[in-house]
Amino acid sequence: GVLRAMAQSLVHRGPDDEGIWHQPMRGVAIGNRRLSIIDIGGGHQPFVSDDGQIAVVQNGEIFNHVELAAELRAQGVKIRSGSDTEVILRLYEREGIACLKRLNGMFAIAIDDAREDALYLARDRIGVKPLYVMDDGRRMLFASEIKAFWPVPSVARSSPAIDLEAIHHYLTFNYIPAPWTVYQGVRHVMPGTWMKYTRGAPVGTRRWWNLADQREQDFSFEDWSVEFMATLDDATRIRLRADVPFGAFLSGGVDSSTI
């Protein structure tokens, strides 16, 4: 079907597994292509709540999922896998969309919640992982890459027009700033933002994280040095969690030489 064709167009992003979630009565369907890094055998997506009312998919990685899982288990929550995506599901069940603030990672997340008749789309704080939305006149579409929209018959027939405003921005700035894309009707979900849809119609957008809102600390240079090294050590440690072999690109610049 169309959803499987959309998912197959992203097989290069997730060559290891495919999952489909379909709620025909509500007109919701989600496809996922998975690159297996955490819990190879038990991380199939979408993750679905025990009552079948909530489904979660993500592209990315939640670096603090081990700590969050331990906290949830201490509160009596049953977690059946080692997957960071299941941790998102269990947190959402308890805290709703506010759970995003608990996540330390790079991610693009879709959460279908039949209880609210709502679909949430969310991106990480600075937008490491991409997420695009498109309204083709009949439905709302979302994907990690724009080309995943092309298998949809209505999109293929209409051949989305070039967005002249986006071209103006490109000629002015030498790039197209978000939320614009080169195509009319195709937009980025902004970093640090979630969007809520009901029956394909947007009903809310909220910035859940903003750098300008972060509190300034009145630290001395020595305090900042200690804080920086502690943060760097912790950031490196939690990014080394994987159930597959991993490597590192060391370019010789300031960042890789520091690590």
Segments and roles (model prediction):
Residues 1-259:
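Cysteine-centered catalytic environments shared across enzyme families
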